Structures are given as structure tokens and as C-alpha cells.
Amino acid sequence: QASIYDFLNNRKWKTDVYQPNEKIDCSFFLNIDEELGQNVYRASLTIQAARPVYNSTYASPLINFKDDNIVFRYQEFQPLEFNENRVQGNDPVAANLTAVLAYYVNIILGLDYDAFALRAGDVYFKKAQNIVNNAPEGRDVAGWKPFDGVRNRYWLAENLNNNRFALIHDALYTYYRKGMDTFYEDEKAGRLEILNGLNYLNTVQTDNPNSMFMQVFFQGKSNELV
């Protein structure tokens, strides 16, 4: 966990300069489920992130998702390295851990930017797609291909970059920036914009039933929308 913390916090993921209090509230929890061989593990990763709501102490969830199928090689005290131009590195199975972490960092950044400005997260969703396109390949490595299942990293990045799902970005901006951020100043107007954001997502669901993004979004919103 210490190596993951250092990897996530000491690497520069974006070009914008932010104050310490403007950092995204997020957590990554890696749970080792099985040892497959010498220094090779199967694990699950829980990813959580939230966005502060303007003029309140409330943080609205961006994502709360568990990735159940991560296989990687790791030796204690080994530094975690990632090169977006060479995602597979010298050892694809070892590189799979940093590829997964970098992927979700970019997904979180994209969601956060989209929640503040329309389509502002595109650059990060494209970075996530680049990781998918160049993802490590190896025995038991999964989650990067369309045939690995219908609920995986491939499909989440695909949804966020596919123009068929363009209303996702309108929904995120409307829900958070126009809805949640105005809720405490004008509850009626804020609630209306939140509903407008959900209506965008309803259109996405109608046009693309059971998409990966919709599952991820509403899984994170289960308590907020009750």
C-alpha cells in the first residue's frame, strides 16, 4: 500500500497547478485474494473518489467501483514505474499493476474535470483509452479486452470516448456544476438541473442499455439518489 501511495501521490498526472486543498478526494484499496506463483498475485482494487460541492461541506461521489480481476507481479520494496508511451514495460505482468492504477487515475481526473466544465475531461479519458490500447498482455491478465467481459476497463473507457455516449459528458457537467453546485443557494433550481442531468443519462440508457458507464455511475450514487 505504501508503494501505491507513493506512486499515486508523487507522480505528476496533470499539467494544471492545484493547491493542496484542491486535490481530488480519492482512495485506492488493493486487496490480495490469491498468490498464483512466486511474487505473482490476483487482487481486487476498490476505487473511490468524490467532488466537493460548492458552498457546502458535502462531497458528491464521482466513482465507487471494485475491479475484481487484477493479476500482477510484485516484489517487496520494488518501485512502481509507469511510462504511458510504453505501458507494457519490460515485464507485462509486473506492469499490469501500474497500468491499472494509471488507468483509474485518468478516469477519476476525467470525471472530475467533466464535473466542472463541459468536456474538460476528454484529454484524460483519451489517456485512459491509450492505456487500454497498449495494455499489458500475459497469462491471467484480463480486463483490457472487449471479450474479457461486459463490465471491465475496456468498456468503461470505450463508453467515455465513444460519441454514441456523448450525452454522458453533458450529464456530468449538468448534474455537478449546474445542479449540485447551485443546490445550497437555490434548492429548486439545483434540483431541476440534477434531474436534467439524470434525464441525459436516461437517454443514454435508452439508446445503449446496460452500458458499463451507467453501472459505474449509479453504483457510486446509490446513497446520494435515495
Language-model regions, residue ranges each:
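Short, mixed-charge aromatic SLiMs
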Residues: 28-31, 129-136, 226
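Start-of-domain marker
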Residues: 1-42, 53-55
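Acidic/His-rich structured neighborhood in mature extracellular/periplasmic domains
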Residues: 37-158
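Hydrophilic extracytoplasmic domains
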Residues: 217-226
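Solvent-exposed, acidic/flexible segments
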Residues: 38, 94-98, 102, 187, ...
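Flexible, glycine-rich surface segments
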Residues: 109, 116-214
